[in-house]
Amino acid sequence: DGTPFTAEDVIFTWQYCTAPDGGCAQKAQYEGVKSVEALDPTTVKVTFTEPKYYPYSAFVGAQSPIIQKAQFKDCVGAKAPGCTSANFGPIGTGPFVVKEFKPNDVVTYVANPNYRDAAKPAFASVTLKGGGDAPSAARAVLETGEFDYAWNMQVEPEVLATMIAKGKGKIETAFGTQVERINLNCFNPDPALGDKRSTTEAGPPPALKDPAVRKALSIAI
């Protein structure tokens, strides 16, 4: 909205999302955050209760945006669900502003006139269509050309190849703010162990006791 984005907004976001009875959907992102301190108007110091292998999701991840203190200061805790206007029209610093929002259907954005880079954004408006599945999203871009971009192209390779052959679009890969990882079960998953399966009491899986197996898994990944 043209007002400064400051460290106080970052601190407030943490306080807002961890307030009791607030119902913040991303509260889990802030687990382990001990304190948030403003060192100057544009710098914050975040202290954790213990070392974090990936400490960024709490404040710069795609799932936990910073909210404006001035807009939400009266919406903390149990008051949060009642702040309909703020909840459906949060003020941010991005290149676009929400013009229309239909839950589980469509979101329409228009260029933010207050954006920090006057030369951007490159588009006057953007429409995001929800619902459907990966094949229908891929088809709308690659096969019919109905949309310009689709996320989640997890479609069988042979099906994807047929769509690409239509010549309406192409596949591009890029880095995002989220992390994909493979979790290895380090405990015995044998169903015969009952409630102890896949717990510390179960001990390691028999196969993983062999160093050669562990090395093979490492090479495969």
Could you tell me what each predicted segment is?
Residues D1-A25, S35-E37, P95-I221:
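Extracytoplasmic/periplasmic ligand-capture domains
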Residues F5, Q26-V76, E100:
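Surface-exposed binding/hinge segments that line
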Residues W14, F48, P55-Y56, T84, ...:
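Tryptophan-centric aromatic hotspots in well-structured domains and transmembrane helices
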Residues K52-T93, V97, K120-F123, T127-L128:
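A short beta-strand/turn structural motif
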